[in-house]
Protein backbone atom coordinates (compact mmCIF):
# COMPACT_ATOMS: atom_id res chain seq x y z
CA UNK A 1 0.00 0.00 0.00
CA UNK A 2 1.19 3.50 -0.84
CA UNK A 3 -0.18 6.31 1.33
CA UNK A 4 0.02 10.03 0.59
CA UNK A 5 0.42 12.14 3.73
CA UNK A 6 -0.01 15.90 3.49
CA UNK A 7 1.20 18.13 6.31
CA UNK A 8 3.95 15.62 7.06
CA UNK A 9 6.48 18.29 8.04
CA UNK A 10 4.36 19.56 10.93
CA UNK A 11 4.84 18.57 14.57
CA UNK A 12 2.54 15.55 14.27
CA UNK A 13 3.37 14.53 10.68
CA UNK A 14 6.57 12.52 11.24
CA UNK A 15 4.80 10.31 13.80
CA UNK A 16 2.04 9.54 11.32
CA UNK A 17 4.57 8.71 8.61
CA UNK A 18 6.52 6.42 10.94
CA UNK A 19 3.32 4.64 11.94
CA UNK A 20 2.57 3.72 8.33
CA UNK A 21 6.19 2.78 7.63
CA UNK A 22 6.25 0.41 10.61
CA UNK A 23 3.08 -1.18 9.29
CA UNK A 24 4.80 -1.92 5.99
CA UNK A 25 3.26 0.81 3.85
CA UNK A 26 5.10 2.98 1.36
CA UNK A 27 4.72 6.64 2.32
CA UNK A 28 4.67 9.56 -0.07
CA UNK A 29 4.69 13.11 1.30
CA UNK A 30 3.74 16.34 -0.45
CA UNK A 31 5.96 19.10 0.89
CA UNK A 32 6.02 22.81 0.21
CA UNK A 33 9.18 24.03 1.95
CA UNK A 34 10.41 21.87 4.83
CA UNK A 35 11.59 18.26 4.80
CA UNK A 36 10.16 15.72 7.21
CA UNK A 37 12.56 15.55 10.15
CA UNK A 38 14.18 12.22 10.90
CA UNK A 39 12.80 10.24 7.98
CA UNK A 40 15.24 10.97 5.16
CA UNK A 41 14.83 8.57 2.24
CA UNK A 42 12.35 6.37 4.12
CA UNK A 43 9.57 8.39 2.49
CA UNK A 44 9.03 9.42 -1.11
CA UNK A 45 9.13 13.20 -1.24
CA UNK A 46 7.22 15.24 -3.80
CA UNK A 47 7.63 19.00 -3.74
CA UNK A 48 4.62 21.13 -4.54
CA UNK A 49 1.77 23.32 -3.34
CA UNK A 50 -1.38 21.85 -1.82
CA UNK A 51 -3.44 24.59 -3.49
CA UNK A 52 -2.11 23.92 -7.01
CA UNK A 53 -3.99 21.26 -9.02
CA UNK A 54 -0.91 20.10 -10.94
CA UNK A 55 1.05 19.48 -7.73
CA UNK A 56 -1.78 17.57 -6.11
CA UNK A 57 -2.56 15.56 -9.24
CA UNK A 58 1.04 14.29 -9.34
CA UNK A 59 0.98 13.56 -5.62
CA UNK A 60 -2.18 11.41 -5.65
CA UNK A 61 -1.25 9.49 -8.78
CA UNK A 62 -0.74 5.84 -7.91
CA UNK A 63 -1.54 6.06 -4.19
CA UNK A 64 -3.95 3.76 -2.38
CA UNK A 65 -4.99 6.19 0.36
CA UNK A 66 -4.67 9.86 1.33
CA UNK A 67 -4.23 11.26 4.84
CA UNK A 68 -4.81 15.01 4.66
CA UNK A 69 -3.32 16.96 7.57
CA UNK A 70 -1.86 20.00 5.78
CA UNK A 71 -3.24 23.21 7.26
CA UNK A 72 -2.41 26.69 8.43
CA UNK A 73 -2.91 26.65 12.20
CA UNK A 74 -3.35 29.20 14.97
CA UNK A 75 -2.15 31.85 15.56
CA UNK A 76 -1.18 32.29 11.89
CA UNK A 77 -4.77 31.69 10.78
CA UNK A 78 -5.98 34.67 12.80
CA UNK A 79 -3.29 36.96 11.39
CA UNK A 80 -3.68 35.81 7.78
CA UNK A 81 -7.28 34.64 7.26
CA UNK A 82 -7.05 34.73 3.46
CA UNK A 83 -4.04 32.42 3.51
CA UNK A 84 -5.85 30.16 5.98
CA UNK A 85 -8.85 29.90 3.67
CA UNK A 86 -6.70 29.30 0.60
CA UNK A 87 -4.78 26.45 2.22
CA UNK A 88 -7.28 24.90 4.63
CA UNK A 89 -10.33 25.12 2.39
CA UNK A 90 -8.86 25.57 -1.08
CA UNK A 91 -6.21 22.91 -0.53
CA UNK A 92 -8.86 20.43 0.59
CA UNK A 93 -10.95 21.22 -2.46
CA UNK A 94 -7.93 20.61 -4.70
CA UNK A 95 -7.33 17.18 -3.15
CA UNK A 96 -11.01 16.24 -3.45
CA UNK A 97 -10.94 17.12 -7.15
CA UNK A 98 -7.72 15.19 -7.74
CA UNK A 99 -9.06 12.06 -6.05
CA UNK A 100 -12.33 12.29 -7.94
CA UNK A 101 -10.48 12.68 -11.24
CA UNK A 102 -8.55 9.45 -10.56
CA UNK A 103 -11.72 7.55 -11.34
CA UNK A 104 -11.14 4.99 -8.57
CA UNK A 105 -12.30 4.95 -4.97
CA UNK A 106 -9.54 5.25 -2.34
CA UNK A 107 -9.68 6.02 1.39
CA UNK A 108 -9.50 9.73 2.18
CA UNK A 109 -8.81 10.49 5.85
CA UNK A 110 -9.29 14.13 6.79
CA UNK A 111 -7.81 15.39 10.04
CA UNK A 112 -10.16 17.98 11.49
CA UNK A 113 -10.31 19.62 14.90
CA UNK A 114 -12.55 19.57 17.94
CA UNK A 115 -12.31 23.37 17.85
CA UNK A 116 -15.17 23.38 15.32
CA UNK A 117 -17.54 22.99 18.29
CA UNK A 118 -16.41 26.35 19.65
CA UNK A 119 -16.21 27.10 23.39
CA UNK A 120 -18.76 25.02 25.33
CA UNK A 121 -18.45 25.99 29.02
CA UNK A 122 -22.15 25.28 29.65
CA UNK A 123 -22.18 21.80 28.11
CA UNK A 124 -23.86 19.21 30.33
CA UNK A 125 -22.70 16.13 28.41
CA UNK A 126 -19.65 15.02 26.48
CA UNK A 127 -19.55 16.41 22.96
CA UNK A 128 -20.34 14.20 19.96
CA UNK A 129 -20.51 15.14 16.25
CA UNK A 130 -24.03 13.74 15.89
CA UNK A 131 -25.44 15.49 18.98
CA UNK A 132 -23.72 18.85 19.22
CA UNK A 133 -23.90 21.77 16.82
CA UNK A 134 -20.73 23.42 15.59
CA UNK A 135 -20.14 27.05 16.51
CA UNK A 136 -16.54 27.81 15.47
CA UNK A 137 -15.12 30.92 17.12
CA UNK A 138 -11.83 31.34 15.23
CA UNK A 139 -10.70 31.56 11.63
CA UNK A 140 -8.92 28.24 12.05
CA UNK A 141 -12.03 26.45 13.31
CA UNK A 142 -14.23 28.00 10.62
CA UNK A 143 -11.89 26.86 7.85
CA UNK A 144 -11.75 23.33 9.27
CA UNK A 145 -15.55 23.15 9.38
CA UNK A 146 -15.83 24.55 5.86
CA UNK A 147 -13.40 21.89 4.66
CA UNK A 148 -15.44 19.20 6.44
CA UNK A 149 -18.56 20.35 4.62
CA UNK A 150 -16.78 20.31 1.25
CA UNK A 151 -15.79 16.70 1.87
CA UNK A 152 -19.29 15.60 2.87
CA UNK A 153 -20.77 17.24 -0.21
CA UNK A 154 -18.24 15.61 -2.54
CA UNK A 155 -18.65 12.27 -4.27
CA UNK A 156 -15.47 10.70 -2.81
CA UNK A 157 -15.23 8.19 0.02
CA UNK A 158 -13.98 9.73 3.25
CA UNK A 159 -13.72 9.64 7.00
CA UNK A 160 -13.42 12.83 9.03
CA UNK A 161 -11.47 12.54 12.28
CA UNK A 162 -12.08 15.41 14.68
CA UNK A 163 -9.06 15.45 16.93
CA UNK A 164 -8.80 16.80 20.41
CA UNK A 165 -5.46 18.63 20.67
CA UNK A 166 -2.55 16.20 20.48
CA UNK A 167 0.60 17.27 22.38
CA UNK A 168 3.94 17.39 20.65
CA UNK A 169 6.44 14.54 20.91
CA UNK A 170 8.84 17.04 22.41
CA UNK A 171 8.11 20.28 24.25
CA UNK A 172 10.38 23.26 23.73
CA UNK A 173 10.51 26.36 25.91
CA UNK A 174 9.22 28.47 23.00
CA UNK A 175 6.23 26.12 22.56
CA UNK A 176 5.40 26.41 26.24
CA UNK A 177 5.66 30.17 26.28
CA UNK A 178 3.58 30.64 23.12
CA UNK A 179 0.72 28.27 23.95
CA UNK A 180 0.55 27.48 27.64
CA UNK A 181 -1.41 30.47 28.86
CA UNK A 182 -4.20 30.76 26.25
CA UNK A 183 -6.42 28.22 28.04
CA UNK A 184 -8.07 28.77 31.46
CA UNK A 185 -6.79 26.47 34.19
CA UNK A 186 -10.26 25.07 34.92
CA UNK A 187 -11.18 24.49 31.26
CA UNK A 188 -12.30 20.92 30.62
CA UNK A 189 -9.92 19.05 28.31
CA UNK A 190 -9.49 15.45 27.25
CA UNK A 191 -5.94 14.23 26.85
CA UNK A 192 -5.02 12.25 23.73
CA UNK A 193 -1.62 10.57 23.59
CA UNK A 194 0.22 11.14 20.27
CA UNK A 195 0.64 7.39 19.74
CA UNK A 196 -3.09 6.83 20.18
CA UNK A 197 -3.78 9.57 17.64
CA UNK A 198 -1.47 8.03 15.04
CA UNK A 199 -2.98 4.60 15.67
CA UNK A 200 -6.45 6.01 14.98
CA UNK A 201 -5.26 7.36 11.63
CA UNK A 202 -3.51 4.11 10.69
CA UNK A 203 -6.56 2.02 11.56
CA UNK A 204 -8.87 4.41 9.70
CA UNK A 205 -6.99 3.54 6.52
CA UNK A 206 -6.63 -0.18 7.24
CA UNK A 207 -10.28 -0.63 8.26
CA UNK A 208 -11.74 2.05 6.05
CA UNK A 209 -14.89 0.09 5.27
CA UNK A 210 -16.02 0.34 8.89
CA UNK A 211 -15.55 4.11 9.16
CA UNK A 212 -16.40 5.28 5.63
CA UNK A 213 -18.56 8.42 5.46
CA UNK A 214 -18.42 8.94 9.23
CA UNK A 215 -17.31 11.89 11.36
CA UNK A 216 -15.55 10.54 14.44
CA UNK A 217 -14.20 12.17 17.59
CA UNK A 218 -10.65 11.12 18.39
CA UNK A 219 -9.44 11.62 21.94
CA UNK A 220 -8.25 9.77 25.02
CA UNK A 221 -11.52 8.44 26.41
CA UNK A 222 -13.27 8.71 29.80
CA UNK A 223 -10.16 8.10 31.92
CA UNK A 224 -8.40 11.05 30.28
CA UNK A 225 -11.05 13.70 31.03
CA UNK A 226 -9.26 16.28 33.13
CA UNK A 227 -8.89 20.01 33.68
CA UNK A 228 -6.27 22.02 31.85
CA UNK A 229 -4.36 22.64 35.08
CA UNK A 230 -3.84 18.86 35.38
CA UNK A 231 -2.14 18.74 31.98
CA UNK A 232 0.09 21.74 32.71
CA UNK A 233 0.97 20.43 36.15
CA UNK A 234 1.94 17.03 34.71
CA UNK A 235 3.98 18.45 31.82
CA UNK A 236 5.90 20.92 33.98
CA UNK A 237 6.19 18.43 36.82
CA UNK A 238 8.16 16.18 34.48
CA UNK A 239 10.91 18.80 34.76
CA UNK A 240 10.41 19.52 38.45
CA UNK A 241 8.62 22.82 37.79
CA UNK A 242 5.52 24.02 39.65
CA UNK A 243 2.27 25.28 38.19
CA UNK A 244 2.58 28.96 37.14
CA UNK A 245 0.46 31.51 39.02
CA UNK A 246 -3.23 31.75 38.07
CA UNK A 247 -3.02 35.33 36.78
CA UNK A 248 -0.89 34.26 33.82
CA UNK A 249 -3.67 32.12 32.34
CA UNK A 250 -6.57 33.25 30.15
CA UNK A 251 -10.03 33.61 31.66
CA UNK A 252 -12.25 33.28 28.57
CA UNK A 253 -13.48 29.72 27.87
CA UNK A 254 -11.42 27.90 25.25
CA UNK A 255 -12.75 25.58 22.53
CA UNK A 256 -11.84 22.38 24.37
CA UNK A 257 -14.04 20.02 26.35
CA UNK A 258 -14.74 16.37 27.12
CA UNK A 259 -15.84 14.15 24.23
CA UNK A 260 -17.91 11.06 23.58
CA UNK A 261 -15.45 8.78 21.78
CA UNK A 262 -17.38 5.54 22.31
CA UNK A 263 -18.05 5.12 18.59
CA UNK A 264 -14.50 5.78 17.42
CA UNK A 265 -13.07 3.52 20.13
CA UNK A 266 -15.45 0.70 19.22
CA UNK A 267 -14.54 0.95 15.54
CA UNK A 268 -10.80 1.63 15.83
CA UNK A 269 -9.71 0.42 19.29
CA UNK A 270 -6.96 3.03 19.53
CA UNK A 271 -7.09 4.28 23.13
CA UNK A 272 -4.05 2.64 24.70
CA UNK A 273 -2.04 5.30 26.54
CA UNK A 274 -2.52 7.94 29.22
CA UNK A 275 -1.24 11.30 30.40
CA UNK A 276 1.08 9.48 32.82
CA UNK A 277 2.54 7.55 29.89
CA UNK A 278 3.12 10.83 28.06
CA UNK A 279 4.98 12.26 31.05
CA UNK A 280 7.28 9.22 31.08
CA UNK A 281 7.76 9.41 27.30
CA UNK A 282 8.57 13.10 27.57
CA UNK A 283 11.18 12.56 30.27
CA UNK A 284 12.78 9.76 28.24
CA UNK A 285 13.53 12.19 25.40
CA UNK A 286 15.95 14.13 27.61
CA UNK A 287 19.20 12.95 29.21
CA UNK A 288 18.50 11.30 32.55
CA UNK A 289 21.02 13.49 34.44
CA UNK A 290 19.25 16.60 33.14
CA UNK A 291 15.84 15.38 34.38
CA UNK A 292 17.36 14.48 37.76
CA UNK A 293 19.00 17.89 38.03
CA UNK A 294 15.73 19.66 37.19
CA UNK A 295 13.57 17.56 39.51
CA UNK A 296 15.88 17.50 42.54
CA UNK A 297 17.70 20.81 42.47
CA UNK A 298 16.67 23.45 39.91
CA UNK A 299 12.91 22.90 40.18
CA UNK A 300 12.66 23.04 43.98
CA UNK A 301 14.97 26.04 44.33
CA UNK A 302 14.26 28.12 41.22
CA UNK A 303 11.07 26.65 39.76
CA UNK A 304 8.68 29.35 40.94
CA UNK A 305 10.89 32.03 39.39
CA UNK A 306 11.31 30.14 36.12
CA UNK A 307 7.56 29.72 35.55
CA UNK A 308 6.94 33.40 36.30
CA UNK A 309 9.30 34.28 33.44
CA UNK A 310 7.43 32.13 30.92
Regions found by a protein language model. Give the residues of each.
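Glycine/proline-rich active-site loop of Rossmann-fold NAD(P)-dependent oxidoreductases
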Residues: 154, 168-178, 204-216
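NAD(P)H-binding glycine-rich loop region in Rossmannoid oxidoreductase-like domains
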Residues: 36, 47-87, 119
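Glycine-rich NAD(P)-binding loop of the Rossmann-fold in SDR/ketoreductase-type enzymes
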Residues: 51, 83-94, 134, 138, ...
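Substrate-positioning beta->alpha
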Residues: 182-206, 214
Amino acid sequence: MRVLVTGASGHFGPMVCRSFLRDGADVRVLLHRRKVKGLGTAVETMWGDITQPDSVKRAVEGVDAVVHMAAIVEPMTERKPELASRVNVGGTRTIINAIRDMGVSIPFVYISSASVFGPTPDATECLHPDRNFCNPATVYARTKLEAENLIRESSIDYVILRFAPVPYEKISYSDMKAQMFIIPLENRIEFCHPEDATLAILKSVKHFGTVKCKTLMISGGPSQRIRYKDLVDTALGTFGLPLPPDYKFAKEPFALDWYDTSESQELLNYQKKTLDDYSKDLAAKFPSPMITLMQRFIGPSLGKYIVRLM
